[in-house]
Amino acid sequence: MSTPAFTVVIPARYGASRLPGKPLADLLGEPVVQHVYRRAVESGAARVVVATDDARIESACRDFGAEVLLTAPDHPTGTDRIAEVVDRLALVDEAIVVNLQGDEPLMPPELVALVAERLDTDPDAAIATLATPVTAADELFEPSVVKVVRDHRDHALYFSRAPVPWDRDRFDGIDDGAVAAGGWLRHLGLYAYRAAFLRRFPGLEPAPPERLESLEQLRALWHGFAIQVAATDQRPGPGVDTPADLEAVARRLQSTR
């Protein structure tokens, strides 16, 4: 199956609490955002745009040849920032836009292409995302690991930090083997959107479950938009949230050179 034409937008904020300026943090001689940009280009995207709120990031991106837009500084979410980009680029409503976070230098390009492809082949979905099997009990019960439940069409029914679906008979003392065989899915935070949805998103009221779980994707479900969830066994490497993450990612990249 051929990959559709799609645009990748990389939101890159300067003001991260645990690692301020992380898009510009040095990673093997290049800023983190340059590694992310390279992954996006390798995905086969027709266009790659960095969206930032900071002139320093804008300047660095221009230095390595990226297309970059300086966006409004007060967007409440990264999705709102991407919605601004969609309007400024005058993308048609049917255009597919992939949101690749600016702190994911280990994201496999194949997954970027996959999420775009799955949205293209599901005309009923406004959004596509990815999930991978949960393989261990501590992963299943970890609130920072978001779980997703799908219907028979691979559309999301719900996302939660809780271990859903709940197995009322087996969760007491469940081991890794039972978890691996249980069919639970871990959400991967990579999204493809139709431009028409992104234009509507800023006007959607935040949903009660979204506030409770602190999961933005629940807003789309609450307002009736279908989310296609493609399963994959391929997991991206860790993102960069802390100085320790930066060191770990550097070691991993160094080992592949």
UniProtKB/Swiss-Prot annotation:
EC number: 2.7.7.38
Catalytic activity: 3-deoxy-alpha-D-manno-oct-2-ulosonate + CTP = CMP-3-deoxy-beta-D-manno-octulosonate + diphosphate
Sections of the chain in a coiled coil: none
Top-level enzyme category: transferase
Keyword Protein transport on entry: no
Pathway: Nucleotide-sugar biosynthesis; CMP-3-deoxy-D-manno-octulosonate biosynthesis; CMP-3-deoxy-D-manno-octulosonate from 3-deoxy-D-manno-octulosonate and CTP: step 1/1; Bacterial outer membrane biogenesis; lipopolysaccharide biosynthesis
Similarity remark: Belongs to the KdsB family.
PANTHER family: 3-DEOXY-MANNO-OCTULOSONATE CYTIDYLYLTRANSFERASE, 3-DEOXY-MANNO-OCTULOSONATE CYTIDYLYLTRANSFERASE, MITOCHONDRIAL
Protein name in the entry: 3-deoxy-manno-octulosonate cytidylyltransferase
Organism: Halorhodospira halophila (strain DSM 244 / SL1)
Originating gene: kdsB
